[in-house]
């Protein structure tokens, strides 16, 4: 061993929760990898374990506590960070011997805790970090976080109390990170935040340098600039503010993917008011029709909550009726789960669990029928598909209408070899409720 080198300390890492937390994990790991730390595959082979927790729902907290317990049992030297870290008393009560507990976005505190537990062993002769940093996603796609926090105060959500108000990154910084990812081989950028369409409001839409000019910290301006990088750009967590209309022409022009992830949560005006969400869903239907007239290939993904406190059968029927008329391409649904500290717990009496379960079943059955009709309409069409997983005879990929992890897949038979990250044209031959099947042409 060279005299300036010593054995590299090893870190085991657990990342729980949403894609935004995954980006936090990538940032922490990139920093530590640059300092010479190595990643261990198992807890018992590491010098320290970091657990990035989720604290949004009680079930997520339970999963986080279980992960911490497993790390303590298998290793015993554990640092906790993430959203649940904003409530350290609850964690310390269960696990008093943790090395450190830090809150969300506390990158420097996590790194400092690692330094204290196991100091870095620098190796000046190795380039330890790839150009795109340490990524926890496959090489061909990456999450691009453009802001932290949220200015909304939805009654079912405690994110602002965990992550604070909206803090946007300068547009130039976002674009430089995106360009770096593209140069490293990323073919798809998934734009994320707590509230993507509010991007830049805290910066008063200030301009920042980018290439030979400037770009403003504004949702549409950023989307347009990202669209010039020559890769798929997918927009997530978009609230239906009026200026969202301006991004639809970019989708029609092929600058960004014709895909809009827009969490609408419900359709009954009275439920939406209890949620403190925009309540004019009739106008929302008009806007969706307008968007589709501009961009016929638009796929809208949304999530809904059933069994919200006080939800009546009539209010639930309003949701089903709206869903049938909207004909959304991609839909997720969750029975309401109480969140400690959320205002929703006090707005109305809870809906019984058995009623929530029954409404969830009816919702999913109704949407499955819509989804199957929309999927069958694609049979015979030729679609571009990005390959996620290559196989000996059949590969698995996604169309422009499908985000990783949350949407369906396209199963691709191909006579020629394909690799993860390839974008191939596929003739669709068969459709299921959520997946498509076809052959590469």
Curated annotation (Swiss-Prot):
Its EC number is 2.8.4.4. GO terms for molecular function: 4 iron, 4 sulfur cluster binding; aspartic acid methylthiotransferase activity; metal ion binding; protein methylthiotransferase activity. The keyword Disulfide bond does not apply. The keyword Metal-binding applies. It is found in: Cytoplasm. GO terms for cellular component: cytosol. Residues 136-373 form the Radical SAM core domain. Residues 376-441 form the TRAM domain. [4Fe-4S] cluster 2 binds at residues 150, 154, 157. It catalyses: L-aspartate(89)-[ribosomal protein uS12]-hydrogen + (sulfur carrier)-SH + AH2 + 2 S-adenosyl-L-methionine = 3-methylsulfanyl-L-aspartate(89)-[ribosomal protein uS12]-hydrogen + (sulfur carrier)-H + 5'-deoxyadenosine + L-methionine + A + S-adenosyl-L-homocysteine + 2 H(+). Belongs to the methylthiotransferase family. RimO subfamily. Catalyzes the methylthiolation of an aspartic acid residue of ribosomal protein uS12. This is Ribosomal protein uS12 methylthiotransferase RimO. It comes from Methylobacterium sp. (strain 4-46).
């Amino acid at each position: 061993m060279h005299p300036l080198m010593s054995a590299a300390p090893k870190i085991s890492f657990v990342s729980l929760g949403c894609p935004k937390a995954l980006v936090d994990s990538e940032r922490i790991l990139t920093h530590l990898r640059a300092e010479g730390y190595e990643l261990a595959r198992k807890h018992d082979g590491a010098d320290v374990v970091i657990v990035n927790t989720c604290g949004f729902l009680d079930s997520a907290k339970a999963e986080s506590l279980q992960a911490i317990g497993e790390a303590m049992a298998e290793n015993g030297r554990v640092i906790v960070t993430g959203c649940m870290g904003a409530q350290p008393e609850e964690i310390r009560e269960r696990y008093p011997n943790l090395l450190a507990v830090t809150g969300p976005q506390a990158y420097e505190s996590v790194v400092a805790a690692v330094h204290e537990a196991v100091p870095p062993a620098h190796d000046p002769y190795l380039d330890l970090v790839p150009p795109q940093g340490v990524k926890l996603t496959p090489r061909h796609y990456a999450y691009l976080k453009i802001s932290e926090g949220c200015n909304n105060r939805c009654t079912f959500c405690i994110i602002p109390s965990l992550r604070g108000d909206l803090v946007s990154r300068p547009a130039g910084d976002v674009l430089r990170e995106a360009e770096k990812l593209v140069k490293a081989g990323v073919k798809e950028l998934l734009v994320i935040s707590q509230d993507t369409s509010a991007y830049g409001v805290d910066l008063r839409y200030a301009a920042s340098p980018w290439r030979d000019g400037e770009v403003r910290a504004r949702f549409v301006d950023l989307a347009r600039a990202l669209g010039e990088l020559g890769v798929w750009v997918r927009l997530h967590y978009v609230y239906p503010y009026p200026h969202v209309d301006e991004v639809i022409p970019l989708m029609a022009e092929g600058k960004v993917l014709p895909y809009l992830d827009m969490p609408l949560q419900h359709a009954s005006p009275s439920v939406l008011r209890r949620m403190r969400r925009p309540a004019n869903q009739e106008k929302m239907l008009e806007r969706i029709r307008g968007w589709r007239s501009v961009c016929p290939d638009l796929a809208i993904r949304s999530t809904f909550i059933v069994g919200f406190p006080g939800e009546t059968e009539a209010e639930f029927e309003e949701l089903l009726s709206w869903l049938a008329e909207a004909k959304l391409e991609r839909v997720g649904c969750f029975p309401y789960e109480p969140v400690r500290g959320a205002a929703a717990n006090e707005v109305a009496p809870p809906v019984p669990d058995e009623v929530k379960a029954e409404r969830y079943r009816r919702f999913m059955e109704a949407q499955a029928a819509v989804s199957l009709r929309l999927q069958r309409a694609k049979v015979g069409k030729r679609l571009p598909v990005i390959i996620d997983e290559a196989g000996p005879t059949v590969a698995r990929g996604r169309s422009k209408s499908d985000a990783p992890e949350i949407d369906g897949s396209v199963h691709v038979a191909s006579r020629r070899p394909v690799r993860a990250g390839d974008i191939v044209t596929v003739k669709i031959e068969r459709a299921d409720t959520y997946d498509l099947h076809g052959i590469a042409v």
